UniProtKB/Swiss-Prot annotation:
Protein name, per record: Large ribosomal subunit protein uL5
Family note: Belongs to the universal ribosomal protein uL5 family.
GO CC entries: ribonucleoprotein complex; ribosome
Gene Ontology BP term (one): translation
The species this protein was found in: Clostridium botulinum (strain Loch Maree / Type A3)
Entry's Gene Ontology molecular function annotations: rRNA binding; structural constituent of ribosome; tRNA binding
Gene: rplE
InterPro entries xrefs: Ribosomal_uL5, Ribosomal_uL5_bac-type, Ribosomal_uL5_C, Ribosomal_uL5_CS, Ribosomal_uL5_dom_sf, Ribosomal_uL5_N
Keyword field: Ribonucleoprotein, Ribosomal protein, RNA-binding, rRNA-binding, tRNA-binding
Taxonomic superkingdom: Bacteria
Stored HAMAP family: Ribosomal_uL5_B (MF_01333_B)
Length: 180
């Protein structure tokens, strides 16, 4: 079965974007390529259990096993050595990506306290969008009494759009609640 958001993209968003930007070919229309969710766990250098808990949380949220991210080089001031695991990340594509985007837009973001929309300034100039989340509790899979610590995460939407304007419209049509 096709995810709800993918169906919406194919049925409504493609034609809306073609009208708005005047694309000649359907293959020119920007689409979501992947979503990368990254959790940096600073205290992992002293406490490996913290990293395991973060990996478990991220696996619950995304339904996919995260890979560990390691330090590129040693930094004495931060007390880190090269190849020391310091976080975890998941790359979602295809169906999993649409399922996650749907859950983020329609379930998780509305649960954020004092939520007034996501910033429309977090585009990188190449049509990718980044959003930071302060706590993992906004996702329904995380049980409040089972977590050891509140952790945040970065979520990056990678699109095939050439410009930020095209990417913004793509995400807006998919339902991303941008702040006015």
């Amino acid at each position: 079965m096709m995810p709800r958001l993918q169906e919406k993209y194919e049925k409504e968003v493609v034609s809306a974007l073609m009208d708005k930007f005047g694309y000649k070919n359907i293959m020119e229309v920007p689409k979501l390529e992947k979503i990368v969710i990254n959790m940096g766990v600073g205290e992992a250098k002293e406490n490996q259990k913290a990293l395991e808990a973060a990996v478990e949380d991220l696996a619950k949220i995304t339904g996919q096993k995260p890979i560990l991210t390691k330090a590129k080089k040693s930094v004495a001031n931060f007390k880190i050595r090269e190849n020391m695991p310091l976080g975890c990340k998941v790359t979602l594509r295809k169906q999993n990506m649409y399922e996650f985007a749907d859950k983020l837009i329609n379930v998780a973001l509305p649960r954020v306290r004092d939520f007034s929309g996501v910033s429309s300034k977090s585009f990188d100039g190449r049509g990718n969008y980044a959003i930071g989340i302060k706590e993992q509790l906004i996702f329904p899979e995380i049980e409040f009494d089972k977590i050891d610590k509140i952790r945040g995460m970065d979520i990056i939407f990678v699109t095939t759009a050439k410009t930020d304007e095209e990417a913004r419209e793509l995400l807006r049509f998919l339902g991303m609640p941008f702040a006015r």
